[in-house]
């Protein structure tokens, strides 16, 4: 008989999942706020803007109409059609709505792609630094992340000639993210073309995380779909449309892979939320003025934050032109980014993300998010300047 005092026997692979260090920072900040301290949050990677009113109204209208049932496991056809039309308008790419699978956010989309592709010991090539969840997805499914240490002056992007050195008989996919988290960098067309050539020559698909697509402030933006069909694109509405809590994403994949991913989706998730899909249609088909206004505000914040960080002695060797992050080198102060972020939080009440959250390739770095008001960013920069200025004056490394 089961005893309430028995210990649960948990799987080793679940215990091996690494934590989000940023959550430790956030939770510590929340405790401090509960005690009455004013904390400036520069660690959170989500828009501070509300979702546009016309998107909210579409969801409300859908609920009133009774759009609260299961949908097709691939998602509403009008939403899939709107997605492929969006890619055509932006990039001139002809896609079929039947290549699209709607998911409850981008993370389930990534998980579904990895579940469809990976066998035990299969390798996935990815850059280091990387988004924290990537290795956990791969390892949990029995795969092996293969890390390519990348160069900040190239925006920490995978370079084709370097990637070739990491190919093996076990390579199952190459994973890219542009615009990127944590760096806020946009991959060049040359890099995308080179990686696409590898995919086509070797028969190795590229998994492209494009969740920050559209959040770009300088230069041209491209998608891997311009250069190869041998790709699984994962995208969503969270960042560009300020819809993080709505949980709406999608996969664009080769036609021959749709049925496999659809079956997995049916078993694990069934379908995405019906009225949220209706909101997604409104987001894509409605006015984009709200998005344009957000991008202008983000850009002003980006320029201000970058200038202030450089002025206080942090190094940013390539200008970030996408997403809403600045990844700054703080190694003149400390090689331990987690302890440094704790000190900043405790001493001056600013929450920032330690670089170690994104792999040892970002250790000694700090990630700053400008998805906060300009007033809060200014206050945060003033506090950081006081923190780093004191340590410059004392002329010593904190750790």
List the predicted regions and their residue ranges.
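PLP-dependent class I/II
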Residues: 1-10, 15-20, 25-28, 32-38, ...
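Conserved N-terminal alpha-helix of the aminotransferase class I/II PLP-enzyme fold
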Residues: 70-103
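A glycine-/small-polar-enriched, mobile loop at the entrance of the PLP active site in fold-type I
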Residues: 40-48, 61-80
